């Protein structure tokens, strides 16, 4: 949620194709205020329960592709970014817990690199751009660590992984690679106001790109055009990176959860499932919309399934607030799916509870309801899966579901950002496998055949959990507004 000092503006206009639009731009969280790296470092130290020690992190290094002189696309290590806000390669970071000093070490000036790719980050520039106590060149790192260690009887340096020690030959140093990662995961689980603003901005750009696809979908002939339009819109608004590979799946391809070929003709396929989200300053958005190529549903079957998923999402979103067990919402989504699929004749021969216990709904809804969103699209948390040992759901096959998303923490907390992304899919491999199982008695395969061309429907929004409810950060149109956007 934006603070009272947020600057904002709104721009209104008319698309040349006759569509009115409104874009709301917020400047907070972009370039006007610094990423709160020092506060993040203090939070991690507090989570570690320490009053002394040194945290050391290294950024991603510059690398070339295998057997090539071409550089690998750079992607910053997210834990490093969380304690620095620096999206540059070949840097190092220390946080002196006792002295409360956060220091960035940047590469030494390289004339050849400056000529070929531009100058690297300098200490003076780093101090202006980032929330640091000090910025130095890398050649000072070893000396400074030795100086820090010489003032302590038992110096301990906290690192993420055993293979990420600083390049320093000092036998008297002790390294702890067990405690830092879970402490940082616990801190990253709850987003501060600055982080929420970055996720909000990523969602604004994603919404704009989804709208552009809807405006042009009628004239598109191939999945590649959808991919290209989405990417073009994001890049033109300053978001060069995607949070994940764009999924532009038409027809039966929409039943493939992580379809990324995006190269088939649209022809007369009923629906397109576009799962795509821009990244802004290393923070992700994760947005899915499923839509026809015309401003109406091309079949009763496609309209039916969209309505099912829409109800699943709306009821689960409305149940979000601090203290709610996310697992309960996941189970709620399955109950709704079963009720609706029974009414359509896709499921048969049992009560909602019987079918839930059988696992038959997993054939159509095989993944989790959602996941954390932050520096990773599937962001970290100290408890990566929901509580399997709960007597309430013991033995329920729904708890074994996996991709495209892991299940969130047992209880929601204010400041979490989670997705709610139910879906119903008609996957030929899943249905073929179901025929061989006892649960097949609950599935009317003759009715299912009419729904195969639908492929799949998924609707996904990014939701900020608050103490008394939620805020939906995703503004891309869906439902009736989505159909009205198609021209």
Swiss-Prot record:
The keyword Manganese applies. Mn(2+) 2 binds at residues 275, 286, 460. Its EC number is 3.4.11.9. InterPro entries: Aminopep_P_N, Creatin/AminoP/Spt16_N, Creatinase/aminopeptidase-like, Pept_M24, Peptidase_M24B_aminopep-P_CS, X-Pro_dipept-like. The keyword Transmembrane does not apply. One of its GO terms (biological process) is proteolysis. Mn(2+) 1 binds at residues 286, 421, 460. This is Probable Xaa-Pro aminopeptidase CPC735_009100. The lineage of its organism: Eukaryota, Fungi, Dikarya, Ascomycota, Pezizomycotina.
């Amino acid at each position: 949620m934006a603070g009272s000092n947020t600057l904002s503006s709104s721009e209104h206009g008319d698309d040349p194709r006759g569509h009115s639009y409104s874009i709301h731009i917020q400047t907070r969280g972009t370039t006007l205020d610094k990423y709160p790296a020092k506060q993040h470092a203090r939070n991690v130290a507090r989570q570690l329960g320490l009053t002394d020690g040194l945290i050391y992190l290294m950024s991603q290094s510059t690398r070339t592709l295998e057997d090539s002189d071409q550089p690998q696309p750079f992607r910053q290590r997210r834990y490093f970014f969380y304690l620095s806000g620096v999206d540059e390669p070949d840097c190092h970071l220390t946080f002196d817990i006792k002295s409360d000093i956060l220091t960035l070490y940047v590469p030494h000036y390289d004339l050849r690199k400056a000529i070929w790719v531009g100058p690297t980050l300098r200490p003076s520039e780093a101090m202006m751009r980032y929330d640091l106590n000090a910025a130095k060149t890398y050649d000072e790192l070893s000396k400074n660590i030795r100086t820090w260690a010489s003032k302590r009887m038992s110096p301990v340096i906290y690192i993420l992984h055993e293979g990420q020690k600083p390049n320093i030959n000092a036998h008297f140093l002790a390294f702890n690679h067990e405690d830092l990662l879970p402490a940082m995961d616990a801190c990253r689980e709850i987003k501060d106001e600055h982080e929420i603003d970055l996720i909000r901005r990523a969602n604004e750009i994603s919404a704009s790109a989804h709208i552009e696809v809807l405006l042009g979908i009628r004239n598109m002939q191939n999945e590649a055009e959808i991919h290209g339009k989405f990417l073009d819109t994001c890049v033109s608004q300053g978001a060069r990176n995607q949070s994940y590979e764009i999924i532009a799946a038409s027809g039966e391809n929409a039943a493939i959860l992580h379809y990324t070929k995006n190269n088939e003709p649209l022809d007369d396929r009923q629906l397109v499932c576009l799962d795509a989200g821009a990244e802004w300053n290393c923070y992700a958005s994760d947005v899915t919309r499923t839509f026809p190529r015309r401003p109406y549903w091309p079949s009763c079957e496609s309209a039916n399934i969209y309505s099912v998923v829409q109800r699943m999402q709306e009821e689960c979103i409305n149940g979000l607030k601090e203290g709610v067990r996310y697992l309960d919402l996941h189970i709620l989504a399955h109950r709704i799916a079963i009720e609706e699929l029974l009414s359509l004749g896709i499921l048969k021969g049992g009560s909602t509870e019987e079918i839930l216990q059988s696992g038959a709904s997993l054939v159509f809804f095989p993944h989790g309801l959602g996941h954390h969103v932050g520096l990773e699209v599937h962001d970290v948390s100290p408890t990566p899966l929901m509580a399997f040992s709960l007597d309430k759901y013991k033995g329920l096959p729904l708890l074994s579901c996996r991709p495209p998303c892991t299940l969130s923490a047992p209880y929601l907390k204010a400041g979490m950002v989670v997705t709610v992304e139910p879906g119903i899919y008609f996957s030929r491999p899943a249905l073929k496998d179901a025929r061989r199982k006892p649960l097949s008695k609950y599935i009317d395969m003759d009715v299912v055949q009419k729904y195969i061309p639908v492929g799949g429907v998924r609707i996904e929004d990014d939701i900020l959990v608050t103490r008394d409810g939620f805020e939906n950060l995703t503004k891309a149109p869906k439902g009736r507004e989505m159909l009205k956007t198609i021209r």
